[in-house]
From Swiss-Prot:
The keyword Metal-binding does not apply. Residues 20-38 have a biased composition (Low complexity). Residues 1-55 are annotated as: Disordered. Residues 7-19 have a biased composition (Basic and acidic residues). It comes from Dictyostelium discoideum. This is Uncharacterized protein DDB_G0292160. PANTHER family: RAGULATOR COMPLEX PROTEIN LAMTOR1. A lipid is attached at G2 (N-myristoyl glycine). GO terms for biological process: cellular response to amino acid stimulus; positive regulation of MAPK cascade; regulation of receptor recycling. GO terms for cellular component: autophagosome; lipid droplet; Ragulator complex. The keyword Transport does not apply.
Amino acid sequence: MGCVVSKSDDIKNENESRQRNQASSSQQPSSSQTPSKQIGIAAKDSEEQPQEVSYSQMRELDNDFFKDIIDRTAQKFIDVSMVGPDGKDSFLDREKDYSAQIKDSKLLKPTSLTSLPRLSQQCQMSNLQNLLSQPTTFDNELMSKYTSSISENLNGIHIKECGELVVFFGNSLK
């Protein structure tokens, strides 16, 4: 690059590459932005030319698509308000059984839920890391207080009838 001949060769090569780039870009149509596609509609292979759609039309098409989803979902709901008196009796029996099961289940060792690990017999208290990793007395008291509070609240749960709960498991949006 230090001599005059190589500098003129460099300029010549730049001009040639610039001309090639301009020729190739003039042959290819340039598009600065890709067209928008509607949500939920798969692109067809036969569509080579993108359809020009205004923003408001795209918004209306998307709203129609979402409205269709909502309508199909509404058709799949189960109306439990039409349950006859026979269904209500079985519901009351199930509610009583469930309530009795919860009342009968007691937490025998509430501290085992949130207890912290203990030092094994093999660990020596002279080991500073093991000594410092032990919980403080305040932490132990705090954890036991919260554990007993949680245990009391769980054992005192009262269940009242609120109605049937229906959950549909399946492909409801297909």
